[in-house]
Amino acid sequence: MSQIPVATLGVPRIGRRRELKFALEAYWGGESSEGELLAAAAKIRAENWSLQKAAGASIIPSNDFTLYDHVLDMAVTLGAIPEIYGWAGGAVPLDTYFAMARGSQEREACGHSHHDGTGVPALEMTKWFDTNYHYMVPEFDADQTFRLASLKPVEEFDEAKRQGIHTRPVLLGPVSFLKLGKRRDGGDPLELLPRLVPVYAELLGKLLRAGADWVQIDEPCLVLDLTERERRAFTIAYDALAATGGPKLMLATYFGGLGDNLPTAAALPVAGLHLDLVRAPDQLQDVLSAAPEERVISLGVVDGRNIWRTDIAALLDRLGPIVKGNPGRFQLAPSCSLLHVPLDLSIETGVDPELRSWLAFAVQKVEELSILSHALSADRSLVQSLIDMASRALAVRASSTRVNDPHVAGRLSAVTPEMAKRSEPFSERRKLQQERLNLPAFPTTTIGSFPQTAEVRQARAACAKGELSEAGYDGFLKGETEKAIRWQEEIGIDVLVHGEFERNDMVQYFSEQLSGYAFTKQGWVQSYGSRCVRPPIIFGDVSRPQPMTVDWATYAQSLTDKPVKGMLTGPVTMLQWSFVRDDLPRETVCRQIAFALRDEVSDLEAAGIGVIQIDEPALREGLPLREAERPAYLDWAVECFRLASSGVKPETQIHTHMCYAEFNDIIDAIAAMDADVISIETSRSKMELLRAFRAFRYPNDIGPGVFDIHSPRVPPADEMADLLRKAEDGLDPRQIWVNPDCGLKTRKWEEVRFALANMVEAARQMRAG
């Protein structure tokens, strides 16, 4: 039997030691040249190609690398560059590219000046499907034209060829490219498809002439709910591309199953089809029945989005009968691009040997596919020892006392509906809370964090290195906390926060104190551009060995007679921003986290903290891609929040916070959370996001953000008061709190002081009528 090819759809592009991050920041900071940045990028690409080849991949991608974002790259390649950036044709300057990604304070970025002197804004950024990666949203005009403005896909194919590696270039497909973008006039981007497809055909022709016999063309939107018109767009686009010749196309779908889009995908004139068989393992037989026999099927059987070792023996049992009859029809691949996992476990030093044996990062996942290919295609005995090693590690994991905690399982089995309900309705709770807190109309507060200055970061680093004692660090943090409390009192904020100076990250801070979590030193993944994150790993049952925030909350409360909020990260966000164990349903893991937080909430209340905030910025991010699957998710997500928050007395006030999002499709769930107060980002939308709350007649209190914490601009008090008057249109003034859009951790103190003073003044104006 011939060897079944091993393909990768994309790999992490940040480098083994985050070289891309540091190269970008040096360039943006004026510390290196364009040539030095491009040389660093070329080195990462070369290392990635070599790593994949050494790990056993026979089909290696090119053009999966990007300096910032692959969707932005596609927009630039196709000439979809908004007029504001000043591109007039020819080669696209690197600074124009970065202005689209990050905005620019420089007038030269767009070739003309602006009335406000603030340069040009970045394109909008949003989540890539249901992952924690962010992409830049392409913008189109109604009369948008496209042209081949960059030959990056061809150049990187040639670059790999010079290295002796024949690659399969990767392109984001035309229909997904348009669907992921937006038209400035609010029209349907798919109307632009007839103008776009010829440019794709031109690019594919150039790749063919360069020697690319196959091209991977990603159409992840095929796993979404589509209208018949949208399905027709796929047919139109790929019929047109097929008519022009060009290389063979491997149409890649991922993040779910084709579902009711299968007939459309099966009928497209493409040579290959990639399937996500991790998210949707049951679709394979239907695809094999529907697709032409000559269609190559890429089997996405290794999880490209999580870091757990694959059960190779189980996969062999499952795939053996399928590939046996026609091995030449199949390729083996990860479920999606490996962008979403760290690059290489071999450089990781932060996890113990046992836990390490349960993990697989990008390189190891390619190695797993190579083992699978050998076992399916050749003599299994040649790799049997490696298969056995994986099976032993999985068996140890399944039976480990580190993973399974009977006490946690017992608590979950004893859950009752009453545990997820407050003892009194909101109307009664509000009266009791007002008696306790005695707050004015339009009460003011902040979302939680205050600026993490260089001094705070230096003290944390010094403590971590042993250069500053724990006692010294604790004293420093207490000093910062007291300054924050005193300053909030001086300007007249009503419900205070302690500032969170002791916290490095809103998820990491808590997960470091919970059982069942582990942390890496080199497990970096790209969030966007140069921003990299190290998601914690949930490997076992989650519990809280001891209180996590009570000492800091009670210290801050001891400094003032005003209420100080206890600050927690909610269970859904703790789940969404972690690598989650794959041996339990996600909702079960979330309930475990909810119980740990429930204990913390109870301890805060017992310690005299009367206002407790449980942030859930990731609640909407967890929504399944398919509409039919969303109600079940929202049911357990809301239940977990309520499990965490409902064990308190009615006079204890529960707050939550959600970041910038569309709320229309989840407003029922937000109301069902039954938080006494919700704060949301609304300033950038000029309170437009409140429409959903007005239409729903949202019953509880709400704090619409009155200034954008992402901007250094400090709006005057009158402007904030105007926003609050807009909020009054449709909301009862008694419902309205006054707060910023989000936490202030990344801002400078000079900005924060003026902004919050103006915010307090705006609230005073509202009280005065």
UniProtKB/Swiss-Prot annotation:
InterPro entries: Cbl-indep_Met_Synth_N, Cobalamin-indep_Met_synthase, Met_Synth_C/arc, UROD/MetE-like_sf. Catalyzes the transfer of a methyl group from 5-methyltetrahydrofolate to homocysteine resulting in methionine formation. CDD domains: CIMS_C_terminal_like, CIMS_N_terminal_like. This is 5-methyltetrahydropteroyltriglutamate--homocysteine methyltransferase. Pathway: Amino-acid biosynthesis; L-methionine biosynthesis via de novo pathway; L-methionine from L-homocysteine (MetE route): step 1/1. One of its GO terms (biological process) is methylation. The keyword Repeat applies. Its cofactor is Zn(2+). L-methionine binds at I447, G448, S449, E500, D615. Belongs to the vitamin-B12 independent methionine synthase family. Keywords: Amino-acid biosynthesis, Metal-binding, Methionine biosynthesis, Methyltransferase, Repeat, Transferase, Zinc. 5-methyltetrahydropteroyltri-L-glutamate binds at R18, E19, L20, K21, K127, R531, C532, W577, E621. Binds 1 zinc ion per subunit. L-homocysteine binds at I447, G448, S449, E500, D615. It catalyses: 5-methyltetrahydropteroyltri-L-glutamate + L-homocysteine = tetrahydropteroyltri-L-glutamate + L-methionine. It comes from Chelativorans sp. (strain BNC1). GO terms for molecular function: 5-methyltetrahydropteroyltriglutamate-homocysteine S-methyltransferase activity; zinc ion binding. The active site is at H710 (proton donor). Zn(2+) binds at H657, C659, E681, C742. Its EC number is 2.1.1.14.
